[in-house]
Regions:
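Glycine-rich helix-loop "coupling/hinge" segments at transmembrane-helix boundaries
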Residues: 130-131, 206-243, 262-265
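Transmembrane alpha-helical segments of polytopic membrane transport and secretion proteins
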Residues: 1-29, 252-265
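Transmembrane alpha-helix signature in integral membrane proteins
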Residues: 67-101
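Cytoplasmic-entry segments and transmembrane alpha-helices of multi-pass inner-membrane transporters
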Residues: 94-129, 153-160, 168
Length: 265
């Protein structure tokens, strides 16, 4: 039976206390911000029509939950984000592997990937609408366009920086490039893939919202544009808050996947 020393117990106690303080401080800052916002709106320090207030936003959310319209908008945005994220993850891994397998191809395509990654993706959205029409497919492609080029470059860089000695060992044992890929490169790059996924989930959400601004009839992005046009600031700020919560939730899911991987491997 393992026994924990006094020093270890003291360290764990301090660690738990530190985490508790951090969580309490986070909640306190948020609570103070909401209270200050509500007080300023009620006393007229800020214009409640323009800036709304937490109570108005909560009331607006309750009304949309009652008529269930908010679930449609959340579901549409969540579906498009997850699909675009999964496609980005799949295609970026496949293309990064292809570039790693062919040095000549990587040298040919590298400048194009750099240029495409540097393009402002919001400028591509109108072009995608013309090409694909105002459909959910267009929004999914818009979400992919924000993340995929940078993801390919990051994964390819990760593949090329794997320990060369391990790859040489594979070849010394008469292994092939395929063996090096599946025995060394991909297993060594799993942390980089997960790290990339954490970034991509947020980027895909941004791309989906940009697409919904221009080519949607449902979704939180559409709700933001519509509410800004009719000056319903309660709807607008509520939609932004829901997007923040969605982003945090999706990021947390990837974090859980990372912890499961770390515990198993």
């Amino acid at each position: 039976m393992n026994k924990i020393s006094h020093g270890q117990e003291l360290f764990l106690s301090r660690l738990r206390r530190h985490r508790l303080i951090v969580r309490f401080a986070r909640v306190l800052i948020l609570a103070l911000f909401l209270i200050l916002w509500e007080v300023c709106a009620d006393t007229g320090i800020i214009d409640s029509f323009i800036f709304s207030s937490p109570s108005k936003i909560a009331l607006c959310f309750r009304e949309m939950v009652t008529d269930r319209s908010i679930f449609l908008h959340i579901g549409v945005t969540l579906y498009e984000t997850i699909v675009s994220f999964l496609l980005v993850t799949l295609f970026s891994i496949l293309l990064a592997v292809l570039l790693w397998c062919s040095r000549k191809l990587s040298e040919i395509l590298e400048p194009y990937l750099v240029v495409l990654n540097s393009l402002p993706k919001s400028a591509l959205a109108p072009l995608l609408i013309v090409w694909l029409g105002a459909t959910p497919t267009t929004i999914i492609v818009a979400g992919m366009s924000v993340a995929i080029f940078g993801s390919i470059m990051n994964l390819y860089t990760s593949f090329t920086t794997v320990d060369r000695e391990k790859i040489k060992l594979i070849y010394t044992l008469h292994g092939t490039r395929r063996h090096a890929l599946f025995k060394v490169v991909l297993p060594s790059s799993v942390p980089a893939v997960i790290s990339n996924m954490k970034v991509n989930i947020g980027l895909c959400l941004v791309g989906v919202v940009i697409g919904e601004f221009l080519a949607a009839r449902n979704g939180l992005g559409y709700l933001i544009i519509y509410s800004s046009q009719v000056f319903k600031m309660d709807w607008l700020i509520m939609s932004i808050v829901l997007l923040c919560i969605m982003a945090m939730g999706l990021y947390a899911v990837i974090g859980v996947v990372e912890k499961i991987y770390q515990k198993r491997f």
